[in-house]
Every structure is written in C-alpha cells, then in structure tokens.
Amino acid sequence: MEYEYPIDLDWSNEEMISVINFFNHVEKYYESGVTAGDFMGAYKRFKEIVPAKAEEKQIFNTFEKSSGYNSYKAVQDVKTHSEEQRVKAKK
C-alpha cells in the first residue's frame, strides 16, 4: 500500500525510524501476523517517543485515515497474548 506515516519533523531520525517500525508492526498485524513480543517491543519504543495519550490518539487517527489500520485495536488485541504467540487481526 502507498500511504504516508504520521511523522513529527521535530523527532530525530532514530525516533522517526522507531515510529515507522511500530507502524510496520501494525501493518503486519493486519496483513500477515506478528509475534506479540515483537509488536509490544515496538509499541514500547513508540511510547518512549510519544508518551502523551492525546498525541498518541492523534497519531493513530492520522495513520488510520491514511492506511485503514486501527493501531489502537491492534495494541489492545496484542496485549492479551503471550510474547511468543503469533497474532493476526480477525477478518
């Protein structure tokens, strides 16, 4: 798919890469499945960059409008699985 990732230009290159990595995990959750531990590791790093809930919600909404993928639902579902489990969105 072709869409833009929600990026803050005030972030460092490393932070931008980490945020994109998290959204790549969201994509994998919806498309092919992802290991819960890997997903939550990417989300933890995302939260280090975006600690505020309001900003997280805004970024998630921007990504969903662009991609159709609901990051919040992905995080909530993955949280219910053990680290080793492979998780994929239900259709």
Swiss-Prot record:
Signal peptide: none annotated. InterPro entries: BH2638-like_sf, UPF0223. Pfam families: UPF0223. HAMAP family: UPF0223. Belongs to the UPF0223 family. This is UPF0223 protein SAB0963. It comes from Staphylococcus aureus (strain bovine RF122 / ET3-1).
